[in-house]
Amino acid sequence: MNALEKRSVFALASVYAMRMLGLFMVLPVFMLLGEDLQGATPALLGFAIGAYGLSQALLQIPFGMLSDRVGRKRMIYIGLVLFAAGSLLAAATDSIYVVIAGRILQGAGAIASVLMALLSDLTREEERTKAMATVGITIGLSFSVSLVLGPVLGAWWGLSGIFYTTAALAVVALVIVSRLVPTPHQHKTSADTHPAREMLGRVLSDGRLLRLDFGIFALHLVLTALFLVFPSMLQDQFGLATSSHWWFYLSVMVTSFFAMVPFIIVGEKKRRMKPVLCGAIALLTLATAGFTGVSGSLVAAWAVLFFFFMAFNLLEASLPSLISKEAPAASKGT
């Protein structure tokens, strides 16, 4: 990559990182700290955790299409402002209903597809795989860091402090886009990143893609469900204070990542990804069931979470790649 491409990739990966940190720092502590919100119930707390995904799913494609008309950076600015506004709304209230509204507003800044399209505009075709890989690694690292930072910030500043930090990260992302991201002279029409209206029906009727889409949906559903109950287990069953959760998650995420990598390497080199993925699904199922039997043993809880994230990280890294391989070349953006 040339200097301009390196700067663009670094800047856009940083924007991704800021957004991912903001969205997921709240995940490991929300069920614990959210109990003090007015009107809070377990169901409403769970909805608040996942509410951003609803608006994000609905607005992802419209944001991408609008960026073709009004410009990439303009839509990114709008998305980040919405993200910051949602964070401030959630930070400034003690009502669960307003927090839910804030989370929905956070998700409304659905700029992921626009960022990918801008990355495509600013990189040559032969360098795009490296650029996408860099962003993918950044997303994975940001998620892991968010699980460590969330409990620390929650112990220091509470739930509002996490949301205020998220708003600050959005402002930093705005500065990065303004100062470091070049403005493309023209949009490149790339099948890898640009949604096509005429391809939508074809993609939605493809059974193989639908199975993979459902796999990603189920994977993130299980992850969200885990954090509805696991933080409370650490606190109530094992007496681990919220301020101490960070080292538990850090040790699990680091070790599970290194344990997962050899399986991806073997699967790709030997062209045995299907058995590897089936094994990961089986391990994820067993680990999820294993949470019912860890009562009273922190070591057992650590081991089960280790296997859970070993399987989760493997699937998280592989399923999007499989979708890219299965999708027709003309409809990968869709």
Residues covered by each model-derived region:
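Juxtamembrane intracellular "pre-TM" segments in multi-pass secondary transporters
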Residues: 1-5, 182-215
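Short amphipathic helix-loop junctions that connect adjacent transmembrane helices
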Residues: 28-42, 228-244
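Conserved MFS/SLC helix-loop-helix module at the cytosolic interface between two early adjacent transmembrane helices
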Residues: 58-94
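Cytoplasmic membrane-interface "Motif A"-like loop-to-helix N-cap segments
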Residues: 69-79, 268-281
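Cytoplasmic helix-loop-helix junction between adjacent transmembrane helices
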Residues: 102-140
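C-terminal transmembrane helical hairpin of 12-TM major facilitator-type secondary transporters
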Residues: 274-319
